Curated annotation (Swiss-Prot):
Keywords: Acyltransferase, Amino-acid biosynthesis, Cytoplasm, Methionine biosynthesis, Transferase. Transfers an acetyl group from acetyl-CoA to L-homoserine, forming acetyl-L-homoserine. The keyword Transferase applies. This is Homoserine O-acetyltransferase. The active site is at S143, D311, H341.
Amino acid sequence: MPTLAPSGQLEIQAIGDVSTEAGAIITNAEIAYHRWGEYRVDKEGRSNVVLIEHALTGDSNAADWWADLLGPGKAINTDIYCVICTNVIGGCNGSTGPGSMHPDGNFWGNRFPATSIRDQVNAEKQFLDALGITTVAAVLGGSMGGARTLEWAAMYPETVGAAAVLAVSARASAWQIGIQSAQIKAIENDHHWHEGNYYESGCNPATGLGAARRIAHLTYRGELEIDERFGTKAQKNENPLGPYRKPDQRFAVESYLDYQADKLVQRFDAGSYVLLTDALNRHDIGRDRGGLNKALESIKVPVLVAGVDTDILYPYHQQEHLSRNLGNLLAMAKIVSPVGHDAFLTESRQMDRIVRNFFSLISPDEDNPSTYIEFYI
């Protein structure tokens, strides 16, 4: 029986050295995680563990950012499942990353290796191995977490019972790489960046990180939603239409983006942001597997795919591509929302229905045979 973190509390697990697919080594790595629900195994020895994968700037406390979905009696039912959410390797919320201390007593900084989505999954596999968990009932994740979920199904089919892949693609598109590289450049152009070795300077590249967040946040929201909320309105008591442009005289949407930037700067590390954004740029399920469609067809883990109809960052046609080529499509669903990419986090009613049906499909309730999933292709 694995010794797990107390329910709802952050715990750190040592996983040893992590070798990246590009040939680097992250020595003495640690993974931070949260756990909810009791661990059990069935008579075949398969566990009731559900592994949740967070998005780019998320963390392991899924009960916070998916509060409407995770808990006793909820869609991700902790009365039934042992739910585990890790902080990704390279992150800044407890797992080893650029802002962590290297074994030599100094910060990792820019010595921290570049990582891929596959490296992130391999680190999580080492984490499960360290806990003594050999199987999981399901893996669920959206955005960068969806990319990890898809790679889990491709890399470790003997471990994963089923997967729910949300709001992501089979590989990074040129547009995604471009918009994400612009965010990286904003941080690297901050004079406090110091090539990633700023941790001992006492000055963080906050301006660059804030600029990156402004760019990113526009891709997380729907164009129509942003326009309907703000239009061309001026921020209260400010005048962006004066005779000279002044930075403190803003449109309302500028104030909103400033607010989002300030929030992220207070809680996230720029080094981790660059590292994880670069990992998203490297995402390609087909690399060294014969191309996208061949790689998807080879995935035999049952996979539910869901996307958002107004997603700018990962347009819905990318989830349609997944659904048409996966080797074992469990179901396909569309989240209908003006919100855009973030709808998998904010549209709780639709997500509740999708996730409940996902678990009903992988663990049918004999007392409720009418379980179904809605298809929107």
